[in-house]
Amino acid sequence: MPFEIWHGLEDGERLSLTQEAFWSFSQHFQLAKDDQSDLNPGNSIVVDQLEEARLKAKGLAINLSGIMTALDLLTPPANTPLGSVPLGDSVFERKCRGYVIIRDYSFWTDRAVTFLGELKAKYSE
C-alpha cells in the first residue's frame, strides 16, 4: 500500500490492516518453517528463528486486537488458516517464498513501529 494511501486512513483502519497483516505473517512463518525443515533438515537454527518470528507476529496480532478493543473499535475476524495450497514445489520457489515472507515482514514491522509510536503520542495527550 503506497505511503499516501496509508496516511490517509483512519487509525482504526490502520490498526485493522496491521492486525490482519501480522496474523497472516504468523501463518506464513509456519509455511516457511515447514519449507526450511524440508530443505535443510539438519539445521534447526533457522527453524527456531522462524518459530520465534511466528510467535512474535501472533503475539503482536493479539496485542493489536487488545488495543482495538480498548479504543472501542471492531476487531477483524481471524484470518482463515492457510491450507496446503500449492504455492510452488521447487526448491527455488520455496526459497523465494521464504525470502518474500521475510522481506514483507520487515516492511510491516517498520510500518507498525512508526504507526504505533504515532498512536501512542496521539492518545497519550
What does each model-found stretch correspond to?
Residues 1-103, 107-125:
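Long, contiguous alpha-helical bundle segments
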